[in-house]
């Protein structure tokens, strides 16, 4: 019974950590505040593309707490008496560390650093979620939406 409950708890905890919305880093996704907003358009050419990782902003709370709780439960099933309490503490600490690292990895997105030479000669760098159309587009024209947050799309 304990093994079934622990397996179910692990499944729930680690499936929740994968719920980070990584589409917000895509060039095709706009925030609610950007909807119905006039944005300037600038044309340019992709000069280079470099693969990068984008780390979503998260505090690691779900992974740390979930991992700590599950590690504590798993540790408490070991031994008896004082040894059981020590195993529970060690399990909780180990689980918290592991849960935090798992959540961190699950909230990373493959991105692309795009160096773009605008038609006016100025060069800018934009980082957004990787798109397969950027991989082979060095020297192709692109559309750049203006403002403090840019979205790059291939024409």
Curated annotation (Swiss-Prot):
Q: How does it sit in the membrane?
A: Lipid-anchor
Does the record's keyword annotation contain Ligase? Answer: no
From which source organism is this entry?
Haemophilus influenzae (strain ATCC 51907 / DSM 11121 / KW20 / Rd)
Q: Which residues form a coiled coil?
A: none
Stated family: Belongs to the Pcp/SlyB lipoprotein family.
Q: Which residues form the signal peptide?
A: 1-18
Q: Which InterPro entries does UniProt cross-reference here?
A: Bact_OM_lipoprot/Surf_antigen, Gly_zipper_2TM_dom
What UniProt keywords are attached to this protein's entry?
Cell outer membrane, Lipoprotein, Membrane, Palmitate, Signal
The answer to whether UniProt assigns keyword Coiled coil to this entry is: no
**Lipid-substituted positions (N-palmitoyl cysteine):** 19
Lipid-attached positions, S-diacylglycerol cysteine: 19
Q: Name one GO cellular component term.
A: cell outer membrane
Where it sits in the cell: the answer is: Cell outer membrane
> What is the protein's given name?
Outer membrane lipoprotein pcp
